[in-house]
Regions:
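Carbohydrate transferase catalytic cores enriched for Leloir-type hexosyltransferases
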Residues: 1-371
Length: 371
């Protein structure tokens, strides 16, 4: 029988001001890892007096550093301290930790074997889609990840970028993210439609409002589709004001903002089409989540989201508003085809679960510990 694997797993993303998909991914993977036999997970985070205000709650016990996030991230990068083994009250205090998993973003300091997850290298493709400070931070984290024994990434697109960046192929594993089925009472979706005054077909978008999400072109596409509302669900990120971007649609747009998980899934179940024509994603969890509700998807060709949807949705050039409009219009005009794609998407979504991601990740842990 193999030795149990005791993992220190970064969950600081849950406390970020805009937690985003990396926090959802960290929580989903940590929970599924903790459910595996022979694996125990302790979260690692900066100093916090309270649980996350807006992000998901870590599903595992958390050891907190004495340092606040900015100081902790800076210390890890510049001084290699404090080591994870010396943070808080966890098995590492008595030498019980097996390895450390940097689950996205900052890379903790440690002398233990290290696994790092890198979601994307988007700032290298589109520097203008990140702040100058953000680009410096992302580059620092990428350099810190080079000391990892192994790197995981959620898409073949990101893996290709990592190889171009100089990571060795045999040290980089593609492990898709996951999404587990979420039941929605039809009355919850009906209540959302009623509350927002939607009595016909509508298009849904979910994400953080920022330039790479390409809302400008989605709005341009929707201008070509009269009488169909566009619903935007998710928090404000940076450099893009949803109200300004969507102004051309007038009363046809519903800017919902940040919602809880149950409400988000009720929106997925209510939508007639889910559109996410991002210019770049590391994976695109909202696409997978929409597929899980049998909602037909329109997303971007040549990107990680196209990998997620496969042949279970429509992919278009994200820089072509006419193509985006054509795909959405086609689905709204052909309910049978929309339903077929929805069913195909739901079936495909069952192959990408957090359990599957955790099993593949645990295999990486054991591979690292065996070398």
């Amino acid at each position: 029988m193999s030795e149990p694997v005791r993992v220190a797993f970064l969950v600081e993303q849950c406390w970020h001001t805009v937690p985003g998909g990396t926090a959802v991914a960290a929580v989903g993977l940590a929970a599924a890892l903790a459910d595996l036999p022979g694996v125990s997970v302790t979260g690692i985070a900066a100093r916090h007096a309270r649980p996350p205000a807006v992000g998901p709650t870590p599903p595992v016990p958390v050891a907190h550093s004495r340092l606040p996030r900015p100081a902790l991230y800076e210390a890890w990068h510049r001084t290699g301290r404090p080591r994870v083994e010396n943070i808080g009250d966890h098995p590492g205090a008595d030498g019980g930790l097996s390895l450390v998993h940097a689950s996205g973003g900052a890379v903790p300091a440690t002398r233990l074997p290290l696994v790092a997850t890198i979601h994307d290298l988007g700032w290298r493709h589109e520097p203008g889609h990140s702040t100058r400070r953000g680009r410096r931070l992302f580059e620092a984290w990428l350099e810190d990840a080079r000391r990892a024994a192994h790197v995981t990434c959620p898409s073949q697109a990101t893996r290709a970028d990592l190889l171009v960046a100089g990571f060795e192929p045999d040290r980089v594993s593609f492990i898709p993210l996951g999404s587990d089925p979420v039941g929605v009472d039809p009355s919850a979706s009906a209540a959302l439609r009623s509350h927002y005054g939607i009595d016909g077909p509508f298009v849904l978008w979910v994400g953080t409002t920022e330039p790479r999400k390409n809302l400008v072109r989605l709005v341009s596409a929707m201008e070509q589709i009269p009488d169909v509302p566009l619903v935007l669900v998710g928090p404000t990120g940076w450099k893009e004001d949803a109200a300004r971007v969507t102004a051309p649609l007038g009363e046809r747009v519903r800017v919902v903002g940040r919602v809880d998980e149950a409400t988000k899934h009720a929106w997925y179940a209510a939508a007639d089409v889910f559109a996410m024509p991002s210019l770049l994603e590391g994976f695109g969890l909202p696409v997978l989540e929409a597929m899980g509700h049998a909602t037909p998807v329109v997303t971007s060709a040549g990107t990680a989201t196209a990998e997620v949807v496969g042949d279970a949705g429509l992919t278009v050039d994200p820089t072509d508003a006419d193509a985006i409009a054509g795909a959405i219009t086609g689905l709204l005009a052909d309910p049978d085809e929309a339903a077929r794609l929805g069913r195909t998407g739901r079936d495909r979504s069952t192959t990408m679960t957090w359990s599957a991601a955790a099993t593949a990740t645990a295999d990486v842990y054991r591979q690292v510990l065996a070398t």
